[in-house]
Each structure stands twice: as C-alpha cells, then as structure tokens.
Design a protein with these regions (language model features):
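Bacterial Sec-pathway N-terminal export signals of envelope proteins
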Residues: 15-63, 69, 97, 213-255, ...
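Periplasmic alpha-helical coiled-coil/stalk elements that build and connect Gram-negative outer-membrane
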Residues: 21, 128-241, 342-345, 349, ...
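Small/polar (Gly/Ser/Thr/Ala-rich) solvent-exposed segments
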Residues: 34, 57-85, 95-124, 248, ...
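Amphipathic alpha-helical coiled-coil segments
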Residues: 35-50, 125-148, 159, 166, ...
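Transmembrane beta-barrel architecture of outer-membrane proteins
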Residues: 87-89, 135, 180, 271, ...
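Membrane-embedded beta-strand positions in outer-membrane beta-barrel channels/transporters
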Residues: 91-93, 137, 273, 297-299, ...
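Short, charged, amphipathic alpha-helical segments
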Residues: 112, 175-184, 315, 382-390
Length: 428
C-alpha cells in the first residue's frame, strides 16, 4: 500500500510555472542527463560488437603491379632475354571462429548486462538531476519568501521608527527607546540585503540546473504533482531492494565481474577457427599466364606459456569479483540505512511543520497584542515590541523553511526507494 500525496501549500499565480514544467525542462535539457543518455547508445554498440565475434569475417583484396626490366644478364655477364609481366591478383578471405574458450559467449552476456547497467546509471542520474531541480525550484521560492518577509519587516520597523519619533516629541518614550527602534531597523535592513544576495544565488542555481527563468515570481508554491509514498518503513525498504538504482548497479557490476573471469579463463583454453581463401592471378610470370587457387584451412591453437600473463589476468579478475561482491554487500546495508534515514526525516519534517505552523499563529497573536498595548501606552516597552517582531519574523522564516523541507523529504524518500523518475511522476 502507498500513501497518495497531493502537494498543496498556497494558491499560486495565474501565470505561474508549475513544478512539473520545471522538472520536465530539466529532464529534457540538463546536459549531465543528456550525456548519460548517450551512454545508452554506446552500450548498444558494445552489444553489436560482441555479437560480431560469432559472425564470419570477409576480406576482399586485390593487387596489380607493373614490371619494367631495362637489363638482364646471365651468370657469365652476357645479356639474356627477358619478358616483363604485369601481374594482377584478386582474392577473398573468409574466416569463422569455431571455439574461443567461451570468451565470445561471456563477452556477449557482459555487454548485454552493460546495456542494462547503462540504463540503471541513467535512472540514477535522472533521480539526482530531478532532486537537484526540486531543490533549486523550492530554494528559489524560499529565497523569494524570505526576501518578502524581510522587506515587510523593514517596512514595519520604518513605520515604528516614525511612530517612536512622534512619541518622543510628545514625551511618551525616551531617546533610548527610539535608538532601540533605529538599531532594530538597521539590523532588518542588513538582513534584507543578505536576503537579496541569497535570492540572486538561488536564481543562478535554478538556471544552472533547470534553465533560464524570466520572472522568479512566476514559480508556483502550489505543486501540481501527485504521487504515492510508502506507508511504512518496511514497505519502503522492500521497494528499494527491487527498484533502487544504486542496488541495481551494484548487482549488475558483480554479474559483469563473473563474466570477466570466464573471459580471462578463455586465454588458457584452446581456440579453433576455419578459413577459406580463393584467389585469381593473371600474368603471373613469363611461363604462367593465369592461376586460380582455393585454400581451406582449419587451425587449432592452445597457449601453453605466456610469461604468466594469462594466469595473472585470471587472478586479477577473481580479485575484482571479490571486490564487487564486498561492494554489493555494503550497498545492501547502506540501502537500508539510507531508506530508514529518508523515512525518519519525512516523519520528523511533517511533525516539525505542524509545530512551526502553530508557532507562527501564536507569534502573530502575541505580536498583535503587544503592539496594541504598546501603542495604547499600557506598559509595553519598545524592547517588548522589537522582541515580538523578531520572534514573529523568525517564525515566518522557519515556516517557509519547514514547508520546503517537508516537500524535499517526500522527494528524498522517493529517491531512496528508486521512484524519483519521470515515469513515476508522470512528467512525460
């Protein structure tokens, strides 16, 4: 069973760029992902190369030469008669491998595994790029929200400074109270400038991963993606064991290492091939005008000693297989840990979002009450108002951050089980 999830945060803009469009853009245009797609074509060609080992090789060749003898003498030094010839030869060679120690079969199987491996690596890269795109998309939204919150805070403190100046003239507050307000305003302006820089950085990161964006305000916080999440940690782990590309890659690399042993062992085995040559020669010599010849030859060879190279290659392949087995075992253990971490982060971020939402509501009520009491002269000091504004500001920023983290935690959980791909998200 899976939890069906529909993301809804706030109402979006009428002319907005939804998350699905941004992810589709990254999916189609990201250069790293496109480079990995080319690797699929490379693997397809590798399969064709491996198949060619089972097919005969055919070679056509021809030659023609021209003789021009100016002088010819016999053993006594006297001139002797000669006849120049212009030999021409045409031939065809056909060779078929009959046995090569099962290296050809193992090589073909390895190349087919390599094709599946390339597809798994493409899926892994796709997951990484899509998650980076989600981080960039939500990061830019968060930066814009933080900028707006800080802008509102600057506007609020500017009004408070104006109010405190009037209250100082009426003798309702002291100069130190006004100085506190002015200091708070200066701090808010500094945070606003910092938020502006963070927005620029977030925009550059967005364009690096996803692509150009004309209006950062066009991003929609209301996600149009809907998908299912695992309902339990155990289910998430079981799904990941079957679909996580990291595990698939480790398994396939181990399978390839097994084929490498067979290929290395074939260097110690006999090999056999059959060859056929048919040739036709004209004007061969002064006594032979034409010659047609056919040769059928069977060859068997068995390497006896090659300086120990063959045995060393075999031992190397065995060691590499042991290494891949250890890496596979480690990948299985790491997978459970990574899924458990993603699941825990998802649960914690959901609880934290609920807590921060309540915190913001409480901070808004408290700030409104303290502000009214301050303006009514009911005993609230300037410091009380400043502290209340600061608490509310931090709570709003924490809420925006918690909303983003909750969203990211769900996609991270999808990535950990192997479901963060265009097919599952229905991007295409």
């Amino acid at each position: 069973f899976l939890i069906f999830v529909l993301f809804v945060f706030f109402s979006g803009n009428v002319f907005s760029a939804p998350l699905s469009e941004a992810l589709l853009q990254a999916y189609n245009e990201n250069p790293v992902l496109n480079a990995e797609r080319e690797n699929i074509q490379v693997s397809l060609e590798e399969v064709k190369i491996s198949k060619s080992q089972f097919l005969p090789s055919v070679t056509l060749s021809g030659s023609k030469s021209q003789e021009n003898t100016e002088k010819q003498t016999d053993s006594s030094g006297a001139n002797s008669a000669f006849t120049d010839v212009n030999p021409k030869t045409q031939s065809i060679d056909i060779e078929q491998k009959l046995f090569q120690g099962f290296a050809g079969t193992a090589s073909l199987k390895k190349s087919k595994i390599g094709l599946t491996l390339a597809q798994a690596k493409l899926l892994k890269t796709e997951q990484e790029i899509l998650y980076q795109a989600i981080e960039a998309y939500t990061g830019l939204i968060f930066a814009e929200e933080k900028l707006k919150i800080n802008q509102d805070n600057v506007n609020l403190l500017e009004r408070q400074v104006e109010t405190d100046q009037a209250r100082l003239e009426r003798g309702q507050i002291t100069l130190s109270d006004l100085s506190q307000s002015e200091s708070s305003l200066a701090g808010a302006q500094a945070k606003f400038l910092q938020a502006q820089n963070e927005t620029v950085t977030a925009k550059l990161n967005y364009e690096k991963i996803i692509g150009p964006i004309a209006d950062t305000n066009s991003l929609d916080k209301e996600s149009d993606l809907n998908f299912a999440l695992p309902v339990s940690l155990n289910e998430a782990i079981e799904i990941s064991k079957k679909d996580n590309p990291n595990l698939i890659i480790s398994r396939l690399e181990y399978e390839q290492s097994e084929k490498d042993i067979i290929i290395a062992r074939s260097d110690l085995s006999p090999s056999a091939f059959l060859s056929f040559n048919s040739s036709k020669s004209d004007d061969v010599s002064s006594t032979i005008g034409e010659r047609d010849k056919e040769i059928l030859k069977a060859t068997i060879s068995w390497p006896i000693f090659n300086g120990g190279k063959n045995y060393a290659s075999l031992n190397k392949s065995k060691n590499l297989k042991n290494r891949k087995k250890l890496l596979l075992d480690n990948a299985l253990k790491s997978n459970d840990t990574n899924v458990a971490s993603a699941w825990s982060n998802f649960q914690v971020s959901k609880s934290l979002l609920n807590s921060v939402t309540s915190q913001v509501k409480a901070a808004e009520i408290a700030n409104e009450g303290i502000t009214v009491e301050y303006e009514s002269g009911l005993g609230r000091s300037t410091l009380d108002v400043i502290q209340s504004n600061s608490i509310l500001l931090n709570a709003k920023i924490s809420l925006a951050d918690s909303e983003r983290n909750y969203l990211l935690s769900q996609f991270k959980l999808l990535q950990s089980v192997g479901y963060l791909n265009s097919k599952y998200l229905k991007l295409q």
